[in-house]
A protein has these predicted regions:
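Hydrophobic anchor at the beta1->P-loop junction of P-loop NTPases
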Residues: 25
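Conserved lysine of the Walker
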Residues: 33
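Hydrophobic positions on the alpha1 helix immediately C-terminal to the Walker A/P-loop
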Residues: 36, 40
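Sensor-1/coupling segment of RecA-like P-loop NTPase cores
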Residues: 121-142
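Conserved catalytic cores of phosphodiester-cleaving nucleases, focusing on short active-site segments
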Residues: 127, 352, 356, 383-404
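Interdomain motor-coupling "hinge/lid" segment immediately C-terminal to the ATP-binding subdomain
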Residues: 142-259
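Accessory nucleic acid-recognition modules appended to NTPase machines
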Residues: 211-383, 389
Length: 458
């Protein structure tokens, strides 16, 4: 089964722009980076050179690079050893615009990663580098090539990509946000959302569901993916003394999502308490911080910051965690034993978080570096998400409800002038508009929302 991915269009735009920079494609393990890059290379270039630093081809290229770089004191230094290495690796390599070089799992070799500047400045061909654990690049032997790269993040399948598998993408893209379509159209998308929130968007999991229509099989796939991630991650840590560190942190993050609703001052300390029940001496705060940073750099988790009283000038960073895949979120939340209505509400928030996260990564539509939620000290309330638009410089509140619940905090913030508009993203609705200030939208259409006064599509 071939999955159509939104990133393909971005790759075409990068090729057309021809900036001369190396493209760094980031993303979690098993989101389909290798597949889509090979497809892009085959379909858009006369010649593709593919090297995986985690496979035999990587060993072969390192051998070529070593031989091309050989030098003895007193002799002239070798000229353009990287070019010579590519010519040795592939006799048909030519440095022109009809050629693309793809270096996969580049985090496995600092020697090759440190050639990015050369690849950007001395070559005419297109170059893409990628890897699942690029967080390793914070180690001292990796020299970050500032100014010579641009990046794209590839994530698990988004909801519209998921719908494409089942032939419903056109309905998603054209359905009215505020209820003008037949009720059956909204119900159909809602049914697919109910599946998506449980299994998420990892390609192997989606293909499994498409083939068997069995959610329990998908849970097994997710469990295997997370187990492989944990095992592979451990080899990058010299200071791990608890072999189950990542499994414990996953469970602790899920518990923390359930326990806290106002944001906490020190997420690391809270996670340590949950994961280790305050057993002294087993893990240092530094080690926990290292592991959490790794999970973020590996695109497994993300965080949200808190805006006090919906004030974009009062932002408290790192105040809440979310998983970066709905299936992973559901898997670990379900494992806590929490009631399903609690889990369903948290999944709804996670879904909207991912939508805002994408807008921050891909557009200049909203302010901040991560999504924000907000507190309202006056009534000791909380707003699920707060958006400061860079399109009309208005303040938008978002209340997320998996059912048809009332949004008291959001409405009070609107009444008190802290917000200009309020979006109610609900699981049980067809959508509607009230007083040109409050907009009710089906939860599954979160990615269709834009933050400007027209309240429509781009």
């Amino acid at each position: 089964m071939e999955l159509r991915r939104n990133i393909y269009q971005k790759l075409l735009e990068w090729k057309k722009e021809d900036s001369g920079q190396v493209l760094e494609v980031k993303g979690a393990r098993q989101v389909g980076k290798t597949y889509i890059l090979k497809k892009f290379g085959r379909e858009n270039f006369r010649k593709m050179v593919y090297i995986s630093m985690a496979e035999r081809s990587g060993e072969d290229f390192l051998r070529c690079l070593s031989e091309a770089s050989e030098w003895n004191p007193g002799e002239p230094r070798p000229r353009q050893p990287v070019r010579k290495a590519l010519e040795m690796f592939d006799s048909e390599f030519t440095d022109d615009k009809e050629t693309i070089v793809i270096i996969d799992e580049i985090q496995e070799s600092s020697t090759v990663y440190n050639q990015i500047r050369t690849l950007a400045r001395e070559f005419q061909c297109y170059v893409i580098v990628t890897g699942s654990y690029l967080g390793r690049l914070i180690e001292r032997e990796f020299f970050l090539p500032a100014g010579d790269t641009e990046h794209i993040i590839m994530e698990p399948l988004t909801f519209d990509e998921f719908l494409d598998v089942f032939g419903e993408r056109e309905l998603y893209e054209t359905i009215d946000l505020y209820g003008k379509n037949p009720a059956g159209d909204y119900e159909k998308l809602k049914e697919y959302y109910e599946i998506y929130q449980k299994i998420g968007g990892y390609p192997a999991v989606v293909v499994c569901y498409a083939q068997y229509k069995d959610v329990s099989r998908c849970y097994a796939k997710i469990e295997k993916l997370m187990s492989i991630f944990a095992d592979e991650s451990k080899r990058y840590f010299e200071d791990i003394i608890d072999k189950n560190l990542f499994e414990k942190l996953f469970n602790a993050i899920a518990l923390l999502m359930i326990q806290e609703k106002q944001g906490v001052r020190d997420l690391t300390s809270e996670l340590s308490k949950i994961a280790y029940q305050e057993e002294s001496g087993r893990m240092t705060k530094k080690m926990i911080n290292h592991a959490i940073s790794w999970l973020q750099e590996s695109h497994i988790i993300g965080y949200a910051s808190k805006a006090v009283d919906c004030d974009y000038m009062q932002i408290k960073e790192n105040s809440r965690y979310y998983f970066l895949d709905m299936g992973v979120s559901h898997y670990f939340l379900r494992g806590t034993g929490a009631p399903y209505d609690v889990i369903k509400g948290l999944l709804a928030e996670n879904f909207v978080y991912l939508s805002l996260h994408r807008k921050l990564e891909n557009t200049r539509e909203i302010a901040g570096i991560v999504p924000w939620f907000a507190s309202y000290e006056k009534i000791n309330g909380e707003l699920d998400f707060y958006v400061r638009s860079l399109l009309d410089y208005k303040n938008y509140g978002i209340e997320v409800k998996s059912t048809d619940a009332v949004a008291k905090t959001g409405k009070k913030l609107l009444e008190d002038g802290k917000l200009d508009y309020l979006y109610l993203l609900k699981g049980e609705t067809k959508g509607g508009i009230a007083d040109e200030k409050i907009f009710t939208i089906p939860l599954c259409l979160a990615d269709r929302v834009t933050y400007r006064r027209t309240h429509g599509l781009d």
